[in-house]
Amino acid sequence: MGKIINTAYPITTVNGIKVNTSKQCHSSNKENYSTRSIDYIVLHYTGKDTASANANYFTGANRQASAHYFVDDNSIYQSVELRDKAWHCGGSTYYHSHCRNTNSVGIEMCCTAGNY
């Protein structure tokens, strides 16, 4: 059984970096929930740009994807409330037998190739 999440922004600082919530994902790119059970953390590597630029992109409508967090070396943006479902690990095809958008938190690592 996973961690029950019923709050929007439980994390405010990570390693001295303030979590910025100013760039919220457009409502067409996520689903609202009042509570969720989290069993998995999904990490993706964007391969380009900054956390700010990626978070800004998802403020637009009809992107058909989203993530809870965008992270780079100097900043963290939370664009989807943790209690809500982001669309970060597939919709019609899943590659893991149990991990789904509904039971996971999506984190996008925003860095250029070779800058890990």
Task: State what each model feature region is.
Residues 2-116:
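Active-site-adjacent loop/helix surface patches within enzyme catalytic domains
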